[in-house]
Amino acid sequence: MSPIFTCITILCLLAAGSPGEEVAQTPKHLVRGEGQKAKLYCAPIKGHSYVFWYQQVLKNEFKFLISFQNENVFDETGMPKERFSAKCLPNSPCSLEIQATKLEDSAVYFCASSQ
């Protein structure tokens, strides 16, 4: 199979808050081959205690993955736990990790924060 078809592309968006404030999500673009690890980071707006991760597969609606209240998991009903993991540690960016990427993981991953 051609490398083009086995390439996993993960695009990240920035979530906007109030003017001058925004969620910092890194990296902005991430390309991985099948079976490789992918890790994304999200620094919420200062003072926000809730963090949300979403996934949008091409031409589909955003799918909720997981949310945190401070460093505690608040809701993980959408998280595919076999290969995906997420955490929020105090005074550190939150992270979303895919252990062994698959083609169907190609998506936009979006992080948002709220008070």
Curated annotation (Swiss-Prot):
The keyword Metal-binding does not apply. The keyword Ion transport does not apply. Gene3D superfamilies: Immunoglobulins. Disulfide bonds join C42-C111. It is found in: Cell membrane. One of its GO terms (cellular component) is T cell receptor complex. Residues 1-20 form the signal peptide. Keywords: Adaptive immunity, Cell membrane, Disulfide bond, Immunity, Immunoglobulin domain, Membrane, Receptor, Signal, T cell receptor. Residues 21-115 form the Ig-like domain. It comes from the Eukaryota. One of its GO terms (biological process) is cell surface receptor signaling pathway. Alpha-beta TR is a heterodimer composed of an alpha and beta chain; disulfide-linked. The alpha-beta TR is associated with the transmembrane signaling CD3 coreceptor proteins to form the TR-CD3 (TcR or TCR). The assembly of alpha-beta TR heterodimers with CD3 occurs in the endoplasmic reticulum where a single alpha-beta TR heterodimer associates with one CD3D-CD3E heterodimer, one CD3G-CD3E heterodimer and one CD247 homodimer forming a stable octameric structure. CD3D-CD3E and CD3G-CD3E heterodimers preferentially associate with TR alpha and TR beta chains, respectively. This is T cell receptor beta variable 16. It comes from Homo sapiens (Human).
